[in-house]
């Protein structure tokens, strides 16, 4: 027992002395090492807080392929004026291609006087810049009859920064639709809206909105 106590005391004393030991560092400023280029910068990068998607990658639509959750559609929401209805459902059959795991089906009952919208908030907002033109594209199929508009609005949806009517006739086969939106105001917290004024079903996938990209490279 005495030997055990002596060992524990010795260990504690050694730990205390090590923790309080003096350390001296000598720096020889007259003998520098390798010269570092003034153009070389270091930065921490990790795909959190939208450093990649919503950061270096220029895509402005968050969860554009509806793959982020098995049951819900994060960053997407719907809105309908009085007298209109819109329902959403994730589906996993009849998809665009083998790479896609899901698509979003919209069931719409609207009219010109009472519209229904699918809204994306982007990555903590979509940065609308006055005079900037954004390229919109998406894939769709279904059995929908009516008009569709694409918009950039403020977060409340009561200010329209850009709007275009889409020349769409949604049919049974997957078709890619494209358009451009040019913002008339600045708002770092804008949102994207797809506005419907007809009836039927639309299946959507790969909804994309890009600002001008480096060397105008398509898809970022």
How would you name each of these model-derived features?
Residues 22-220:
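Extracellular and organelle-lumenal recognition/adhesion modules and their flexible linkers in secreted
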């Amino acid at each position: 027992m005495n030997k055990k106590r002596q060992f524990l005391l010795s260990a504690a004393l050694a730990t205390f002395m090590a923790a309080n030991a003096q350390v001296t560092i000598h720096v020889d400023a007259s003998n520098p090492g390798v010269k570092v280029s003034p153009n070389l910068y270091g930065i921490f990068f990790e795909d959190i807080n939208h450093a990649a998607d919503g950061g270096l990658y220029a895509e402005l639509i968050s969860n554009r392929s509806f793959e982020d959750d098995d049951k819900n559609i994060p960053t997407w929401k719907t809105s309908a004026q009085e007298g209109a209805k819109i329902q959403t459902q994730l589906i996993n059959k009849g998809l665009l291609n083998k790479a896609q795991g899901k698509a979003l089906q919209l069931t719409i009952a609207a009219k010109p006087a009472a519209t229904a919208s699918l809204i994306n908030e982007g990555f903590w907002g979509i940065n609308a810049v006055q005079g900037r033109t954004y390229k919109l594209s998406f894939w769709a199929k279904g059995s929908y009859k009516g008009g569709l508009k694409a918009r950039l609005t403020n977060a409340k949806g009561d200010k329209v920064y850009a709007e275009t009517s889409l020349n769409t006739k949604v049919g049974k086969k997957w078709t890619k639709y494209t358009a451009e939106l040019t913002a008339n105001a600045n708002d770092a917290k804008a949102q994207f809206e797809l506005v419907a004024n007809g009836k039927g079903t639309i299946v959507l996938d790969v909804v994309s909105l890009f600002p001008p990209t480096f060397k105008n490279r398509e898809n970022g």
